[in-house]
Amino acid sequence: MRSSASRLSSFSSRDSLWNRMPDQISVSEFIAETTEDYNSPTTSSFTTRLHNCRNTVTLLEEALDQDRTALQKVKKSVKAIYNSGQDHVQNEENYAQVLDKFGSNFLSRDNPDLGTAFVKFSTLTKELSTLLKNLLQGLSHNVIFTLDSLLKGDLKGVKGDLKKPFDKAWKDYETKFTKIEKEKREHAKQHGMIRTEITGAEIAEEMEKERRLFQLQMCEYLIKVNEIKTKKGVDLLQNLIKYYHAQCNFFQDGLKTADKLKQYIEKLAADLYNIKQTQDEEKKQLTALRDLIKSSLQLDQKEDSQSRQGGYSMHQLQGNKEYGSEKKGYLLKKSDGIRKVWQRRKCSVKNGILTISHATSNRQPAKLNLLTCQVKPNAEDKKSFDLISHNRTYHFQAEDEQDYVAWISVLTNSKEEALTMAFRGEQSAGENSLEDLTKAIIEDVQRLPGNDICCDCGSSEPTWLSTNLGILTCIECSGIHREMGVHISRIQSLELDKLGTSELLLAKNVGNNSFNDIMEANLPSPSPKPTPSSDMTVRKEYITAKYVDHRFSRKTCSTSSAKLNELLEAIKSRDLLALIQVYAEGVELMEPLLEPGQELGETALHLAVRTADQTSLHLVDFLVQNCGNLDKQTALGNTVLHYCSMYSKPECLKLLLRSKPTVDIVNQAGETALDIAKRLKATQCEDLLSQAKSGKFNPHVHVEYEWNLRQEEIDESDDDLDDKPSPIKKERSPRPQSFCHSSSISPQDKLALPGFSTPRDKQRLSYGAFTNQIFVSTSTDSPTSPTTEAPPLPPRNAGKGPTGPPSTLPLSTQTSSGSSTLSKKRPPPPPPGHKRTLSDPPSPLPHGPPNKGAVPWGNDGGPSSSSKTTNKFEGLSQQSSTSSAKTALGPRVLPKLPQKVALRKTDHLSLDKATIPPEIFQKSSQLAELPQKPPPGDLPPKPTELAPKPQIGDLPPKPGELPPKPQLGDLPPKPQLSDLPPKPQMKDLPPKPQLGDLLAKSQTGDVSPKAQQPSEVTLKSHPLDLSPNVQSRDAIQKQASEDSNDLTPTLPETPVPLPRKINTGKNKVRRVKTIYDCQADNDDELTFIEGEVIIVTGEEDQEWWIGHIEGQPERKGVFPVSFVHILSD
C-alpha cells in the first residue's frame, strides 16, 4: 500500500498524471477493491486507485461521445434511405396508375392485346411497390426506431452529462481530504512536530462517507455504461438481423412475383413482332400513296423548300409589310409624371431607331433603338399602344385606328429589319444595342458596393461572375468555385465570355457587400477569410465552408415552418436578399408552400412565376438556378413550365429553359406546357418551348427587364419639365444632396458646377426647384394640356396673407436662375449616390457662369439683378434647411403619396382662379416662363423706345412692371384657362426674387424713386387689372413684409430683409373629412379611414397638411390633401 504522502503528492500533481493517462481500472478490479474496502477500511488500498477510477471514467466518456456522433450519422443516413424509398414507392404507384389508364385506352379502341399487356405491367409494378413498402416499414421499425430510442434515451445530451454525479463525488472527496490533512498538520505543529505523511489508516474512518459516495457513483456510472453497450451493440445488431430477413423476403417475393409473368412475356414478345410487321406494312402503303398524290399535284420542290424556309421569329407582334419600315408623323405621348397628360410629339422611325422630339426645338430628341423595345397594343383602347424599352415604358396614342395600325406595323417592321441586319453582320458597332446594353449592365454591376474586390479573398478588380449567386470573384477563387460544381456556383468571365442579359440579372441586384452581409455575418475571430496572398488550400477550406456548409451565414429561423414562412414572404415582397437569407439557412427552395388561395402543392418558384413581371425576374432566376429540381409538380400535375404557359410568362420561360427542364411532362389534364401554350395562343411561349424541344434554344438569351441603369441613358424625356406635382398619393422619396453657399461664389455659379455638393444633410433644396421649371407646356405641337385628372386644390387660409400674380414680377430679375420652355437650362447633376430614375432629366452640359454680361439696374451703387437673385436664392436655401420634407427624386415605382418638398411656404405668390380674371391668369403664366437671359452687354432701353415685339432680355428691370405680351415666333398659341393646372405654385419654378422683396427694398432706399413710378402706372393703367378682391399696393406691400421673414440671409454681403409682420388675426378652425382610407408610410404621417373628420392645425406644404382626428388629439400627423374633402362649417 502506498504511503499517504506519496498519494498526496500524486493528488497535487494530478494534472501531469492525467496528461500521461496512467493505468486504468477494470470492472472486475473495481469490484474487488471496493469489496475489500467495504470489509476492512483500515487495511484497504482503495485510496491508491482513486485516480485510476477517474481516468477510466474519462476514457469511457470519450468513447461514448464518439459512438453518439457515429450513431447520429447512421440515423441520418437511414432516414434518408427511408424518405427516398417512400418517394420511390409513391412514384411507382403513380407510374402504375397512369400505365393502367393508358392500357384501358387501348382496350376501348379495339386493341385488346396491347391493352392487356399494359395492364399486366401496371399490376406487376403495384405488387413490387407493395413489397418495397413492407421493406421500408421493416427498416423503420427495426433500425430507425432502435436508433431513436438510444439517441433520445441513454445517449441523450452532450459530452460529460453522464459523469456529472461522479465528478461531484470526486470533488467532495478531494475537498474533505484536503481539510483533514490541513487539520492534522496544524495539530502536529502546535505540539512542535512536523507531519510529513498521513497514512490511510488514520483517515479511513473520517473519510468513509465520502469514499462510499464515490464508490456508489462509480457503480452507477459503470452500470449505465453497461446498459448503453448492450443497446448499441447486441440490441442494434439483433434488429439489423431482423431487417436482413425482411430484405431476403423482399427479394424472394419480388422474384416470385416477376416469375408469374415469365411465360406471358415470352408470348407477348412474339405477338409484338407480328404487330410491328403489320404496322410497317401499313406505313409503307401510306408512304407510297403520299408520293403518288404529291406527284399528281406537280409541286414545285424549289418553291416548297423556300416557303418552308423560316426566317427568324421575334416572338412578338408581326406588322403589315405594306406600311414599310419608315414613317414620320405625330403621336400623343402620355407623360411619365403624376398628372399623366397626353402631349403631342413629332415622331419618326428610320433604320431601327424611333426618334421622339421634345416640346422645344433646342433640346436634342430622344432616340430609342427598337432592338431593345417591344411594341404592345392596348387591349382597352384601340388607338393606344405601349413601347416597352429596357428601362422605361412609353404610352402612345394615334389619331385614329388606321394611323394606329400604320404605326404598329412600321415599328414592328423596322425592328425586324434591324434584327435581320444584325444577324447578317451589316449593323455597325455603334448601333448594336444589345451589346451596348450588356456592356452597360456589366459596368453598372462593377460599380455596386463591394464589387471592386473579390467576394472571398478581397483581391482587387475581380472579373469572374457567379451567375447563380450574383457575386464577383478573382481568378484564383473562381477556380475553386468551378471545383464545387455548377449546383453550388456557376462561373463565367465578364471579359472572356459572351454573356446574355439573362445571366446578369442576379449580378445587377445582389453585389458582393449585400451577399457577404448574409453569408459572412457570423465570421469567427480571428477571421478564417483568406487574403489575396493566401494559398489555394486556405481558399478552398474557406470557400467550401462558406458556400457548401453555409457555416458563417446568419441564422434567423429555428424551425422548418418558420423558414418556409420566410421563403413565402420573400417571394411576396420581392426581396432578393431575404430570399438569399432563406437559402443560406438551408431551406429546400422547392418545398410546397402552405399559402391559402393558391394551388395545392405550389412551390416558391410556381408563385414567383405566377406573380412575375419585368421588375421581379431576378427572383425567378435565383430560384431556377439554385433549387435543383425544376420538374416539381403541383397537386394538379403542373410544373413551372405549365405555369409559364398558363400565365403567359415568356421571360420566365427563357430563364427556365436555360437550365434544361423536362419539357414533355403532362399534368392531370394530360397536357404538356407546349399544349397549353398552343391552346391559349401564347405564341411567344409556344415558340420558345418548340425551340427547347428541338434542341435549338440558345441559353445566352436576352430578357426584357427593368434594368434601371445608373449611367446616362439615351432615352431622354422632357416629362420632368412638363409635369408638376399634383395631389395624388405618391411615395415621399429621399431628398437629393443639398447645395450650400460660400462667401466667394454665388449660388448661381455653384449650381453651374457639375459636381457641386455639400456634406450637410439638412440644408437642402428641393430638386424640383431646378427640374420642374415649366408650368404650362408651350409645345408647338400641342398648345393644350388638359388637366382634368388632377382635382382642384383647396383654397389657402386668408391668414397667410394676400396673393399677388406672378406676372407682376420684373422679368429681368429672373435672368440668373429663371428658365422657360423656350430656353431651358439643364438642372444640376444628381448627387453621387443618386440612382438615376426613369424620370430624371439628363445631366447638365458644362456652361459658363450665368451672370456673365448681366447689366446692373438702378443707380451704380445699387445691387444688380444677379445679386437680387442671389439674395432670394440664399433665402430659399436657408428656409429649406429647417424643413424635414422630401423631394421628387425617388424612383418612379408605385407612386403613392405626394412628395413633401423642402420649400414649404412658397405658395404666397400663387394665383387663385376664383379672384383673378382668365386673361390675367393666362398671361401671368406665360410671362413667368419666358426666357430670362439678356444678351451680354445690352443696356435696357427706355420704356418709350420699346419695339412692338420686344425681346424679354431687353425689357427694363423695373419692379412691378408688367410688360406687353411678347410675340416671339416660337411661342405656342395662347393657352386657354381650361388647359392650365389647378393652381400654379412657385415651388415648381426656379428660385428667383419676389416682387415683395423688391418693394420692401425700395422703401429702404435700395430702389430709386424713379423705379417705383412705373410700378404704380402699370398697376393702374395696364389692361390686365386685378379684381377688387386684390388690392395691389397694400397686398404687395403686406406680402413683401411677410416674405421677408422667410428669407434669412446667409452671407455677410446679403442685404438684411425687413422683419416679417406677424399675423395676429385669429384663424378659423378648418375641418376636413376623409374620402379614402390611408395607411401611413412614415412615422410622422397620419393613418385614417374613410369618413373620419380631421382638424387642420397647419400646412407642411401645398399637398401635405398637418392635423389630428377630431376627438382623438393623440392621433396626429401629416396627411395628403387629395385624400380629404374640406368641410364648410
From Swiss-Prot:
Keyword Cell division listed? The answer is no
List all Pro residues biased stretches. Answer: 932-943, 956-966
Domain SH3 span(s) in chain numbering: 1067-1129
Query: Could you tell me where the Basic and acidic residues compositional bias lies?
Result: 723-734
Task: State where composition is biased (Low complexity).
Answer: 777-788, 809-822, 876-889
Domain notes per entry: The PH domain most probably contributes to the phosphoinositide-dependent regulation of ADP ribosylation factors.
The name this protein goes by in its record: Arf-GAP with SH3 domain, ANK repeat and PH domain-containing protein 1
User: Which taxonomic lineage does the organism of this UniProt entry have?
Assistant: Eukaryota, Metazoa, Chordata, Craniata, Vertebrata
Q: Per UniProt, what is the name of the gene that codes for the protein in this document?
A: ASAP1
